[in-house]
Each structure stands twice: as C-alpha cells, then as structure tokens.
Amino acid sequence: MSFRIAVVGKGGVGKTTISALLVRALHERTGKVVMAVDADPNSNLGEKLGVMPERTIGDLREKMLKSADDLPAGQSKQEYVEYQMRLATVEGDGFDLLSMGRPEGPGCYCYINNIMRTFLDEAMDDYDFVVIDNEAGMEHLSRRTTKSMDVLVAVSDPTKTGMETVGRLVSLAKEMKIEVGCLALVVNGVRGQQIPVVEQMAEGMIQCKAFTVPFSDDLANLNAEGRSLLELGESDHVFRAVKAMSDQLIHFV
C-alpha cells in the first residue's frame, strides 16, 4: 500500500512548487521512485519536475468519447484505456508523472472515468509514495479519483486571506468525508519577520501540524525562468524545509 500525499491550495500560493519539492525530497530521502500525479488542469507540475508530458488523461478521455468503437482489433475498451494510460506516464529522475490534463467536456464519461479510477488506484499501489497536486476545489478527491489520503497538505501564502482559504478547504474535505489520516498546513514564502504572525494565525487551525517554508530568491528565479526545481541546490533553505517537512509527515501517520 502506498503512502499518499494530496496537496491543495488556491492559485498563486506555491502549491505546485511544494508538490514538486515533496516529490524530490521523498525520492532523495528514500531512494524510491515516487509517483507524481498532476490533477490540476491549470498546473505545470511536469515543468517544475523538468519533464513535458506529451499525453494527458484528459486527452485520452476525449479521444475515447469520440471514437469509443474504433479500437484495435481484439482489444477491449478497458485494455485500451489502461494501455494508453501507461503510455501517458512519463518517467523522470526518481519519479513517474501522470498528468490529468483538461477537465471533462460535455458528454457521458462515467464508464471511462470508472476504468481510469480503477487503473489509477492500482497503479498507485505499485509505488511506495504518491504525491498528488490537486485542484484548489479538490474535485478529483470528491469524485473519488483516489481511495484515501494519508496526508492532506493545504498550502497558503503568509496572509490572512490565504489562511482563510485553507480553512475553507479543510472544512470542505471534512464535509465530503474524504478519508484523510492527517491534515497539515504549509505556509509558503514566509519572510523572517512574518514567522511569529504566521504561527499565531495557524495555531489551532490544523489537526496535524503547521509548517513554514521560507521565501527564496533562487527558487523565485527558477520559477520565473520556467526551469526545473530539481536544479535547486541541496543547501537551499526552501528545499531543506520541505525535506524536513516530508520526514515529519511520514512519521505522523
């Protein structure tokens, strides 16, 4: 059974950055290949991990809907979907990436989605660690794209508005009865003078633990240039913070 971490947060708070650094940290700490799932149509997890997927699950879903009866001879729909999903999985340095891609258009996707959910759950079980970069509204979790999460990481920026958004996401997770072993808050981009204020705002808000990740000029430059976060130095204080956080999250559950 895999250890699954779902990362959520509103746009612009560094959700995908935290996801990418968690993938890297888990691989470097354990030596295991990590499964990275980009479940946000507006995300660029592949870019931050230094790979560009040529296929997405969304592309496959649309293709199946348009040509469901035009399949290779002797191959069932389920076999075809599973084969295409394997092709859509990109191998990287210490990780495998699967991108969900565009959201559903008009039409009935129930049968296709059921096959995809089954394949995704079975594929996740082949990995020791899975990191899912989710949509802010957690639609994939609510549709049971995955069975359960060991840790739900809610990412915020160091503002009151950001914290309030995280609070709503946590409440939403509870309302949807998503199976979560631990809820964690990550306040990203914190500068030194903000730490006491951030810690005060986070107090009593999360069931598990609150973490702060500092601001980094090097990280900001990599993001601005669209470069892989795997290039971030081992000694960078952001990466060290995420690495320490990943250790604690694993031991919480």
Segments the model singles out, each with a brief description of its role:
Residues 1-2:
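Phosphate-binding P-loop
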Residues 21, 25, 48, 144:
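Active-site signature of alpha/beta-hydrolase-fold catalytic machinery across serine-
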Residues 28-93:
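N-terminal phosphate/diphosphate-binding loop that engages ATP/GTP or pyrophosphate donors
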Residues 78-87, 91, 96-132:
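Cytosolic-facing regulatory segments adjacent to core modules
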Residues 225-236:
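C-terminal boundary of histidine-terminating zinc-finger modules
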Residues 241-253:
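C-terminal alpha-helix
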